[in-house]
Amino acid sequence: PLNGNKLFMSPEKSIETQLYLGSDIMMIFDECTPYPSNKIETEKSMELSLYWAEMSHKANNSKMPLFGIIQGGMYPDLREISLNELIKYDFEGYALGGLSVGEPDYLRKEVIEDIGYKLPEDKPRYLMGVGKPLDIIHAVKNGIDMFDCVIPTRNARNGQLFTSKGVLNIRNTKYEQDLRPIDESCKCFACQNYTRAYIRHLDKCNDILAARLMSIHNVYFYQEFMGQIRLSIENDSFDDLEKKIEKNYLSI
């Protein structure tokens, strides 16, 4: 807290707080294993998270959905142990945690490829903290349904905008007098009402409106992007969407 006092957070307190906030989806109390971490340290961390999972499950005396979080670092056997133990509690959904913590892309992909389709088919599958368009495509391809990430708003605050043709950096000089919207095919509030030049001007002046408009656009882009993924799965055209995203977003 702001006064500097130390607070003890337990699994029970975590659940109590989430219930008080009225969370639509609650998460168990867990430890996000750092990277790099050797197998002994990772296993100890995983076991602590499993212990807290049991306590979180017992503390939830409501009908609010509670998700389990699979830990185990970069070790497939530990991930599988974590998953098998969590399944015993029949959580309303299952999340992959402990990724996007500094590990190389190839390691993260290996973990997702190994564990993604092992998650229960009848429960939501949630990948925590991963949000680049190409990473989302890869994860969906391996059975993941849900994501959360700071990328849309954090990148917006730094002038990086996601468009149907790839990334646009509004701080580039070439946009100084560009009277087009951020993305001419976008129907978000920012694109319908403001030009690239004006948003760039606001950003250069450190006007908070710039960050808000760019955040509105990026969040809208991601909502539309997930809609395109759902539609492509229904229409059996996911591979075509994957090729398009690879073409536009391979560099980030």
Feature names for model-found ranges:
Residues 3, 13-14, 104-106, 166-167, ...:
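Short capping/connector residues at structural and topological boundaries
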Residues 47-50, 59-182:
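Glycine-rich phosphate/ribose-binding loops and adjacent secondary-structure elements
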Residues 35-36, 43, 93-100, 208-211:
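Glycine- and acidic
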Residues 20, 29-36, 183-252:
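C-terminal extensions of enzymes
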Residues 22, 53, 57-60, 90, ...:
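Structural signal for hydrophobic packing residues in well-ordered secondary-structure cores
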Residues 1-61, 173-176:
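Non-catalytic, usually N-terminal nucleic-acid engagement modules in DNA/RNA processing proteins
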Residues 7, 11, 42-49, 79, ...:
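Generic structural signal for well-ordered, non-membrane alpha-helical segments
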Residues 14, 45, 49-52, 56, ...:
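Alpha-helical packing segments of well-folded alpha/beta enzyme cores
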